[in-house]
From Swiss-Prot:
<feature type="domain" description="ACT-like 2">
    <location>
        <begin position="495"/>
        <end position="566"/>
    </location>
</feature>
<dbReference type="InterPro" id="IPR005787">
    <property type="entry name" value="Thr_deHydtase_biosynth"/>
</dbReference>
<dbReference type="GO" id="GO:0009097">
    <property type="term" value="P:isoleucine biosynthetic process"/>
</dbReference>
<protein>
    <recommendedName>
        <fullName>Threonine dehydratase, mitochondrial</fullName>
        <ecNumber>4.3.1.19</ecNumber>
    </recommendedName>
</protein>
<dbReference type="InterPro" id="IPR045865">
    <property type="entry name" value="ACT-like_dom_sf"/>
</dbReference>
<keyword id="KW-0677">Repeat</keyword>
<dbReference type="InterPro" id="IPR001721">
    <property type="entry name" value="TD_ACT-like"/>
</dbReference>
<dbReference type="GO" id="GO:0030170">
    <property type="term" value="F:pyridoxal phosphate binding"/>
</dbReference>
<keyword id="KW-0100">Branched-chain amino acid biosynthesis</keyword>
<comment type="pathway">
    <text>Amino-acid biosynthesis; L-isoleucine biosynthesis; 2-oxobutanoate from L-threonine: step 1/1.</text>
</comment>
<keyword id="KW-0496">Mitochondrion</keyword>
<keyword id="KW-0412">Isoleucine biosynthesis</keyword>
<dbReference type="InterPro" id="IPR000634">
    <property type="entry name" value="Ser/Thr_deHydtase_PyrdxlP-BS"/>
</dbReference>
<dbReference type="InterPro" id="IPR036052">
    <property type="entry name" value="TrpB-like_PALP_sf"/>
</dbReference>
<dbReference type="GO" id="GO:0006567">
    <property type="term" value="P:threonine catabolic process"/>
</dbReference>
<comment type="subunit">
    <text>Homotetramer.</text>
</comment>
<keyword id="KW-0028">Amino-acid biosynthesis</keyword>
Length: 576
């Protein structure tokens, strides 16, 4: 036997109870066979687009090599890190912020887009590129194409806010507005790519895009002096390109670092898919953190995420708003909701998910993924931030509507600062009862120790015979109820429904057009959240015999909705 053969690695394979030795050459062939056997045809085709020296022995992408070979530094410098001084002090740990919000298009998306476009051959460059996006990916593709002098087309839904498509147009790309939603725009994008021979640049589900995003991990290890003390990196998750790239690199180079994904409760595509061990589409997806509002995680990104993600933390809107405020206080910069996801997840990981861990010995690195914040969202973020950080309480108080009752309630809340107080005399309630009339008060006030002070205030109110309910987590109260106090009415068979209306022409017309002539619209309150979605609360009087027809109307409408008829705020303030 030759020396060459002796040096080949051996692998033990069990077949039908018998063991056999497989040489190194045959091992490579076996791994390639297993790769084809266990992956979908679409993934095998995707991996085959890569060069041979960009693949591992099992024919899957070698992401460490792809990251090291990335072209992103032709167009950007490394994004800096910032010490989260305030966060570190409050959380009693070492927080270092990775500032992707400071890249040229204010988002990490430029990395993946540029890396893929830079690898196109001359014929592909001459034909041009196309992408479908109404957000950061669109700007990343446009910026990259302009830098490389490649024609680019960006397809966006018709309802895209003007500021977004104007930014893309300013970068030199042709903007095509098509369709009422992202799915229709995506279909048009695929059609144009086929007709014009354009190369489609996906937002996340391609090895070159993933590798471009993975350069973030390489920079973290270079920039953080005590990289050996990094306990976890917190990554916002939408389609999965960022977490796949960061995770694939870190788990090979610094496997001690945990990869923690962060999603919103209403867009938990990775969380749900990991639980079911397969990609799981979401029936509806929340849009507040619009940069991560994806119905289903990518196929390649999920394959990688299954191998590298240690945990996923879910957060809500209020927690995101509080994180935006935290970041502002540490950096004097305002990030978009998706950009604050990582900080919100880190805070929850420390305080709620893993309180048993000694976090004082760890360094945590949340990725601030972007800063494309719509200015008109700031009011909403500011309002909800205090709730997210537990510094404000919303309370519903029922007390006798007699002189002196309000004064007694205020004495209990004092010296806390009252931030809102709503009440209106309702003569109907007084006429309908022989008992002492009741007043329903909607109030909010500032607190330092939320749990302790809520308990204290409620006990003191109850001791006076007042009824108090904490409604800080009641979405109807926060979005609509506070603006409707005093408008109680007695409407037979009234149904109260909250909707998320798309901010586009015809949305209200479609809603009203579907109402039956026998249904009476009894309440309507709209509030814009500075996003592509507006929140609507509607009251509709529906005869009992038409309940099934009404339910079908709700389903066919296609808008996200919740039945709020039994909600405490409605029962106390809007109905008698």
């Amino acid at each position: 036997m030759s020396a060459t053969l002796l040096k080949q690695p051996l692998c033990t394979v069990v077949r039908q109870g018998k063991q056999s030795k497989v040489s190194g050459l045959n091992l490579l062939r076996l791994k390639a066979h297993l790769h084809r056997q266990h992956l979908s045809p679409s993934l095998i085709k995707l991996h085959s687009e890569l060069k041979l020296d960009e693949l591992q022995t099992d024919n899957t992408p070698d992401y460490v090599r792809l990251v090291l070979r990335s072209s992103v530094y032709d167009v950007i410098n490394e994004s800096p890190i910032s010490q989260g001084v305030g966060l570190s002090s409050r959380l009693n740990t070492n927080v270092i912020l990775k500032r992707e919000d400071l890249l040229p298009v204010f988002s990490f998306k430029l990395r993946g887009a540029y890396n893929m476009i830079a690898k196109l051959d001359d014929s592909q460059r001459n034909q041009g590129v196309i992408a479908c996006s109404a957000g950061n990916h669109a700007q990343g593709v446009a910026f990259a194409a302009k830098h490389l002098k490649i024609p680019a087309t960006i397809v966006m839904p018709v309802c895209t806010p003007s500021i977004k498509y104007q930014n893309v147009s300013r970068l030199g790309s042709q903007v095509v507005l098509y369709g009422n939603d992202f799915d229709e725009a995506k279909a048009e994008c695929a059609k144009l790519a086929e007709e014009r021979g354009l190369t489609n640049i996906p937002p996340f589900d391609h090895p070159y895009v993933i590798a471009g995003q993975g350069t973030v991990a390489m920079e973290i290890l270079r920039q953080v002096r005590t990289a050996n003390k990094i306990g976890a990196v917190f990554v916002p998750v939408g389609g999965g390109g960022l977490i796949a790239g960061i995770g694939a690199y870190l788990k090979r180079v610094a496997p001690h670092i945990k990869i923690i994904g962060v999603e919103t409760y209403d867009a938990a595509t990775l969380h749900n898919s990991l639980q079911r061990n397969q990609r799981t589409p979401l029936p509806v997806v929340g849009t507040f953190a619009d940069g991560t509002s994806v119905r289903m995680i990518g196929e390649e990104t999920f394959r990688v995420a299954q191998q590298v993600v240690d945990e996923v933390v879910l957060v809500n809107t209020d927690e995101i708003c509080a994180a935006v405020k935290d970041i502002f206080e540490d950096t004097r910069s305002i990030v978009e909701p998706s950009g604050a996801l990582s900080v919100a997840g880190m805070k929850k990981y420390i305080s709620t998910v893993h309180p048993e861990i000694d976090h004082t010995k760890n360094t945590y690195v949340p990725i601030l993924s972007g800063a494309n914040m719509n200015f008109d969202r700031l009011r909403f973020v500011s309002e909800r931030a205090v709730l997210g950080e537990g510094k404000e309480v919303f309370m519903l108080v029922t007390l006798p509507d007699v002189p002196g009752a309000f004064k007694k309630m205020q004495k209990i809340i004092h010296p806390r600062s009252v931030t809102e107080f709503s009440y209106r005399y309702n003569e109907h309630r007084h006429e309908s009862s022989s008992e002492v009339p009741k007043a329903y008060i909607y109030t909010s006030f500032s607190v330092v120790d939320r749990e302790k002070e809520i308990k204290q205030v409620m006990q003191q109110l109850n001791a006076l015979g007042f009824e108090a309910v904490d409604i800080s987590d009641n979405e109807l109260a926060k979005s609509h109820g506070r603006y409707l106090v005093g408008g109680a009415s007695k409407v037979p068979n009234e149904r109260i429904i909250s909707f998320e209306f798309p901010e586009r022409p015809g949305a209200l017309t479609r809603f009203l057009g579907g109402l039956s002539d026998s249904w009476n619209l009894t309440l309507f309150h709209y509030r814009n959240h500075g996003a592509d979605i507006g929140k609507v609360l509607a009251g509709i009087s529906v005869p009992p015999r038409e309940n099934l027809t009404f339910q079908k109307f709700l389903e066919d409408l296609g808008y996200t909705y919740h039945d709020e008829t039994d909600n405490t705020v409605y029962q106390k303030f809007l109905k008698y």
